[in-house]
């Protein structure tokens, strides 16, 4: 996403614009490139002309930052957030339940380590009922070449839990960069 904010300035007969140009990652909403500044005051008062004159000198810098971000995504994966929650349906399952000698939270952590790009993720919360993984780096595309988002990545984890441990879960993916798996509910 590209955002442009600007203000129109008038000093005597001369006009300029002060602008802020930002590129945002559509998955995370984080700013990945940006430039700002004020154009040289001129006698023209047409806002599109003033914006073009103000921004054109900074576009190479903006584009190089954007390209660096794309290069980082290609090498290190796209960043998403994955949340795990346990639905209390009376089954007694929680993230401290044991499976093959490991707590379910450890099973999930191990899966994350094996399936993220270069094992990159941060466990920012881990309790009996919730786990939150931030800065999760996932591949840009699936094996079939289609784009991968947080929901498709979370589906892989959901299928793993069902196949290997018989754990029912539901994938709730409200956005491209965020997915939530609810364990104990289908």
Q: Model features per residue range: what roles?
A:
Residues 7, 85-89, 141:
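Short strand-loop junctions, especially beta-strand C-caps/beta-turns
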Residues 2-44, 176-186:
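Amphipathic beta-strand/beta-sheet edge segments enriched in Tyr/Trp
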Residues 30-120:
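C-terminal/domain-edge helix-coil "capping" segments
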Residues 99-186:
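Hydrophilic extracytoplasmic domains
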Residues 28, 32-41, 65-73, 137-155, ...:
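Short flexible/disordered coil segments
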């Amino acid at each position: 996403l590209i955002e442009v904010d600007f203000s129109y300035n008038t000093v005597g007969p001369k006009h300029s614009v002060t602008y802020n140009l930002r590129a945002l990652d559509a998955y995370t909403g984080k700013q990945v490139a940006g430039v700002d500044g004020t154009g040289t005051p001129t006698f023209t008062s047409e806002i599109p002309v003033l914006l073009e004159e103000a921004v054109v000198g900074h576009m190479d810098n903006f584009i190089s930052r954007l390209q660096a971000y794309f290069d980082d995504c290609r090498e290190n994966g796209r960043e998403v957030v994955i949340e795990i929650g346990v639905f209390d349906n009376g089954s007694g399952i929680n993230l401290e339940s044991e499976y093959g000698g490991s707590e379910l939270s450890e099973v999930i952590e191990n899966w994350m380590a094996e399936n993220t790009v270069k094992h990159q993720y941060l466990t920012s919360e881990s309790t009996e009922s919730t786990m939150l993984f931030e800065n999760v780096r996932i591949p840009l595309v699936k094996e079939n070449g289609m784009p991968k988002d947080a929901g498709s990545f979370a589906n892989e984890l959901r299928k793993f839990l069902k196949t290997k441990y018989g754990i029912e879960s539901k994938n709730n993916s409200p956005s491209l960069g965020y997915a939530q798996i609810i364990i104990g509910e289908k």
